[in-house]
Amino acid sequence: MANIKSAKKRAIQAEKARKHNASRRSMTRTFIKKVVAAIASGDKAVAQAAFAAAQPILDRMATKGLIHKNKAARHKSRLSAQIVAMQ
C-alpha cells in the first residue's frame, strides 16, 4: 500500500477508473452480443436495428480510449458484412 499522500490518491483514482472502464467495456460487449444474436436469429430488420444502436457506442468507446479505433472499425465492418450477407 502507498504511504505518500499523492500515491494514495492516485491508487483511489485508478481503482475508480478501473470500475468505470469495466462497466463501459461490459456495456460495449453487450451491444455487440445483441447484434450477433440478432444475426443468428436470421431477422435482418432486428439485426440492422441492433447494429444501428451498437455503432455509436463503439465509436464513443474508441473516442474515449476504452478500445482502439481500429478495433471499433473492425467490429463495425465485420458485423456490417454479416448483416449484408443475410438472406
From Swiss-Prot:
This is Small ribosomal subunit protein bS20. GO terms for molecular function: small ribosomal subunit rRNA binding; structural constituent of ribosome. Gene3D superfamilies: Ribosomal protein S20. HAMAP family: Ribosomal_bS20 (MF_00500). One of its GO terms (biological process) is translation. Pfam families: Ribosomal_S20p. The keyword Ribonucleoprotein applies. Residues 1-26 are annotated as: Disordered.
